[in-house]
Amino acid sequence: EMTSSLVGSEMCIRDSPYAYRWKPCYGQKGYGVCMPCNYEVHGIDISHYQGKIDWELLTHNREAKFPIHFIFLKATEGGDHGDDTFTQNFGQARKYGFIRGAYHYFIPKTDARKQADFFIRTVQLAKGDLPPVLDVETTGKQSPQELKTAVKTWLDRVEAHYGVKPILYTSYKFKKRYLSDSIFNAYPYWIAHYYVDSVRYEGKWHFWQHTDVGTVPGIEEEVDLNVFNGTMEELLELTLKTPCIER
């Protein structure tokens, strides 16, 4: 089981409650938002929407009150739509010492094998990278069974190539409604759940995307903020142990 770790050994000292998005904040303020208490490992996820990144400035956030250690980057969407900032930013993330990961935005009506193969062609993962991520946010008017089958097809094909179970990203409500089948419990789970003090999902989870309006020095636009549900050592254990060579 992943454990929620404390910052150092002490509980998070909460700031006085203040209004955040018309709701009281009971945590501490950081990056312009209400930050969850008691997580030591923070991260962001980015795509071309974030614009040009000042990587030198971004590294200073590793020394911040809420240190940013990992970055997920959008690589692909559907069967043929790549993110045009991915290659450069993925290289820069490693060069500047971040733990990096790559994600695919799933289009349910596009053939899942085609989507998996497109991701595989685009993303070369190295030792120390996080497992590949599948981002599922819509049903694309597919039936629940069609959606489950398509998602499982992508996960299986990508796992066969990289030799590691992919991370599954969904919102709290989407997971409960469409992907609650126990077959998906085998995959590390990255949950999107905004404007709540804590994760209400009862199952095991690894990452929590807690806001989409973070303000991070080095990034011009607002950015998604995440926490890892564990220690730095546990995050490193999740990373790839060997480079992914063509199989």
Predicted feature residues:
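Single conserved hydrophobic/aromatic residue that forms the stacking wall/gate
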Residues: 1-8, 12-15
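Structural motif
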Residues: 3-4, 36, 63, 199
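Short, structured coil segments at secondary-structure junctions
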Residues: 7-8, 96, 185, 203
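Hydrophobic single-pass membrane-insertion segments
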Residues: 14-24
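Substrate-binding cleft of extracellular glycoside hydrolase catalytic domains
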Residues: 24-31, 35-155, 159-161
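Functionally critical loop-and-helix segments that line ligand-binding/catalytic clefts
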Residues: 26-50, 56, 180, 184-247
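Flexible, glycine-rich phosphate/dinucleotide-binding loops
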Residues: 80, 109, 175, 198, ...
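Catalytic domains of cell-wall/extracellular-matrix polysaccharide-remodeling enzymes
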Residues: 130-202
